């Protein structure tokens, strides 16, 4: 079967090759015989017999039927021909009053150019009418001379150069008739064409190359053309136009051949290179569907300060106009420079730092945002209170500033707290706060105070809280833990509240803690304490500043930069990769299950074969036992004491049966 397929394939391949070669030969043949369509029209006149029968021809050509036309005996005509009555043809005299329009005149000049172009060239080259007719006769008789193409000429020239010998018979001497001309009217193009020809008579269809003519030859050509109804300068101008048209046709033909050469599925790269080469010099304008920036406008009428502070772009990259200024901690210890920097940051954000907040409405958002604290941390909390007990969940994301080293950390904390409040209200507040720390250090404890505001008036109360942040990977570079007590005011209350916290922190900047607190006057809460929390107000003691400077780089080494946000293309790529992994795992699992199933089926078939072989052996053994019992009963009936010969036969048959039963073929 395979050999037949190979034979059929070889046959098809041979047919394809034959068709391709035949198409190439056909194309070459048509390329050889292809000519200019203007040269297809030919008028032939020759003597021929009208009547094939000789008797009828003689009768038709007898003087009875033939008569001279216009008295010329050399020109005989049939007397039944209608042209016999045209004995007088008057000369045509155009009317003097009829004027020809410029369009008609130009058309007539073009027609004269097409009619008498060959005659003008012959007059310019000094070729007589007999020579021209003889050349036409030679062309019709022998089918024209195939002039070698330019590629063949180049190949022949390369061969001549490689051999180092000039063939004298490759060119023919110039025509004697041209050499005997009294005036040097022959153009260089005509000389080259004459030298290339193998015949004595040059090719009549070769046109004059206009670019190689000098001014005298151009004037002579135009003068020769005026006798044939053309205006002065028409002939050379139309010759140049014809040459440009021929060049354009040649260029278009070359393009078509190049396109045909690049046809097919495997030539996409060549077609692309050809298209790029053609469009290389052009300037391409951007398409109409290119992306344009959307217009930005304010849909509502707002005050300028409110619209500028609250309208934000949705783009993730910050615009250069609203880029916030980054302030760095340069010193610790309550210097005037820090206060000036804080004041400048507050002024740049566009809000007064000491502006009192407006009283909140019940169940509405709390207005008034401190813009100077907005850059440090943002927290949103929603609290619901029913019958003096409220459960609130707040999720806060605090983004700390940059240190000098360029490292930053993001700390996310979620805290669930239950608080007990004296007043029943339902409030939802969003706050952005800024922590300021001051105070001294007392045997490892750090005290910090931060002014804060809350969405409603809450009586001053003292709370103690302990927070722990666990570190999964503890490093012993700075000691495993340190205790700090801090007195802080909650960031959104009008009346300050103090909280003392003992924090245990490691070297991890992102910590999550869950806390539940139930307090009337005291509350215990677990709150996240990031190790690299930046405090903008300077501490009272420089020892705390030194300790911060030492602990901050150690924490920054472990955290590293925040994870960049993925673009939609990267997310789609990641999703596709996950889907491919899942599909690969599923395919692998299916293949393993299929292999296990095949192994199980093979094991079952082997078990069935073993069971069948065991049954066959048991049946064979039972049959042999029955035969032996029958033989024993039969011989015991014949004689109780068997003869020695029988005993030998019996013992030998018994041995044979035992050897068969113990043969390895039946052993299991």
Curated annotation (Swiss-Prot):
InterPro entries from the UniProt entry: SWAP, SWAP_N_domain
GO biological process: mRNA processing; RNA splicing
Compositionally biased region (Acidic residues): 182-214
Coiled-coil segments on the chain, per record: 579-641
Compositional bias ranges of the Basic residues kind: 265-283, 396-435, 475-486, 653-668
PTM section of the record: Phosphorylated in vitro by CLK4.
Residue numbers of Phosphothreonine PTMs: 327, 567
Entry GO CC: nucleoplasm
Keywords annotated in UniProt: Coiled coil, mRNA processing, mRNA splicing, Nucleus, Phosphoprotein
Biased composition (Basic and acidic residues): 290-313, 436-446, 584-611, 619-635
Residue spans of biased composition, Low complexity class: 340-353, 378-395, 487-510, 518-527, 636-645
Tissue expression pattern: Highly expressed in brain. Expressed at intermediate level in lung and liver. In brain, it is expressed in the hippocampus, cerebellum and olfactory bulb.
Annotated spans, Disordered: 173-232, 252-668
Modification type Phosphoserine: residues: 101, 285, 294, 331, 335, 541
Subunit structure, interactors included: Probably interacts with CLK4.
Role summary: Probably functions as an alternative splicing regulator. May regulate the mRNA splicing of genes such as CLK1. May act by regulating members of the CLK kinase family.
PANTHER family assigned: CLK4-ASSOCIATING SERINE_ARGININE RICH PROTEIN, SPLICING FACTOR SUPPRESSOR OF WHITE APRICOT
Sequence similarity: Belongs to the splicing factor SR family.
Descriptive protein name: CLK4-associating serine/arginine rich protein
């Amino acid at each position: 079967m395979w050999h037949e397929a190979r034979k059929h394939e070889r046959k098809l391949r041979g047919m394809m090759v034959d068709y391709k070669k035949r198409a190439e030969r056909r194309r070459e043949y048509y390329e050889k015989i292809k000519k200019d369509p203007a040269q297809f029209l030919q008028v032939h006149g020759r003597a021929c017999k009208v009547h094939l029968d000789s008797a009828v021809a003689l009768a038709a050509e007898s003087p009875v039927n033939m008569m001279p036309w216009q008295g010329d005996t050399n020109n005989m005509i049939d007397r039944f021909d209608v042209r016999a009555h045209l004995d007088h043809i008057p000369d045509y005299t155009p009317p003097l009053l009829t004027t020809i329009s410029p369009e008609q005149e130009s058309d007539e000049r073009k027609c004269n150019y097409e009619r008498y172009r060959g005659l003008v060239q012959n007059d310019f080259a000094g070729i007589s009418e007999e020579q021209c007719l003889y050349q036409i006769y030679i062309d019709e008789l022998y089918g024209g001379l195939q002039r070698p193409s330019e590629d063949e000429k180049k190949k022949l020239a390369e061969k001549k150069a490689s051999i180092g010998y000039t063939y004298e018979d490759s060119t023919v001497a110039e025509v004697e008739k041209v050499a005997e001309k009294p005036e040097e009217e022959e153009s260089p193009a005509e000389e080259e064409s004459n030298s290339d020809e193998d015949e004595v008579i040059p090719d009549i269809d070769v046109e004059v190359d206009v670019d190689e003519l000098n001014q005298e030859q151009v004037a002579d050509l135009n003068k020769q053309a005026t006798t044939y109804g053309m205006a002065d300068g028409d002939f050379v101008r139309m010759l140049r136009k014809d040459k440009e048209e021929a060049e354009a046709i040649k260029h278009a033909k070359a393009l078509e051949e190049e396109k045909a050469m690049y046809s097919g599925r495997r030539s996409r790269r060549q077609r692309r290179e050809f298209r790029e080469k053609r469009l290389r010099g052009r300037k391409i304008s951007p398409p109409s569907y290119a992306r344009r920036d959307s217009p930005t406008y304010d849909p509502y009428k707002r005050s300028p300060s409110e619209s500028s502070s609250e309208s934000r772009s949705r783009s993730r990259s910050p615009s250069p106009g609203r880029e916030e200024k980054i302030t760095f901690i340069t010193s610790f210890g309550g210097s005037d420079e820090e206060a000036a920097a804080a004041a400048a940051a507050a002024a740049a954000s566009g809000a007064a730092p000491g502006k009192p907040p407006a009283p909140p409405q019940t169940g509405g958002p709390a207005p008034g945002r401190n813009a100077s604290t907005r850059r440090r941390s943002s927290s949103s909390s929603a609290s619901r209170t029913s019958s003096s007990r409220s459960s609130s969940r707040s999720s806060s994301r605090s983004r700390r500033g940059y240190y000098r080293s360029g490292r930053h950390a993001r700390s996310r904390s979620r805290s669930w707290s239950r608080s007990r409040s004296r007043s029943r209200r339902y409030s939802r507040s969003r706050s952005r706060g800024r922590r300021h720390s001051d105070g001294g250090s007392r045997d490892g404890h750090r005290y910090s105070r931060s002014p804060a505001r809350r969405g409603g008036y809450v009586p001053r109360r003292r709370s103690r809280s302990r927070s722990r942040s666990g570190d999964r990977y503890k490093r012993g570079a700075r000691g495993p833990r340190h205790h700090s007590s801090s007195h802080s005011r909650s960031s959104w209350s009008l009346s300050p509240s103090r909280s003392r916290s003992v924090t245990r922190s490691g070297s991890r900047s992102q910590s999550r803690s869950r806390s539940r607190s139930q307090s009337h006057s005291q509350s215990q809460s677990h709150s996240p304490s990031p190790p690299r929390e930046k405090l903008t107000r300077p501490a009272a003691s420089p020892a705390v500043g030194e300790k911060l400077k030492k602990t901050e780089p150690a924490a920054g080494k472990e955290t590293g930069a925040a994870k960049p946000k993925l673009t939609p293309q990267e997310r789609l790529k990641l999703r596709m990769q996950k889907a491919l992994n899942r599909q690969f795992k599923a395919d692998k699992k299916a293949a393993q299950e299929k292999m296990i199933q095949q192994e199980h089926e093979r094991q079952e078939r082997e078990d069935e074969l073993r069971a069948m072989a065991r049954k066959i052996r048991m049946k064979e053994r039972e049959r042999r036992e029955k035969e032996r019992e029958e033989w024993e009963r039969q011989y015991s009936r014949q004689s109780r004491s068997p003869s020695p010969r029988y005993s030998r036969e019996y013992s030998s048959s018994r041995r044979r049966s035992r050897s068969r039963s113990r043969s390895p073929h039946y052993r299991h």
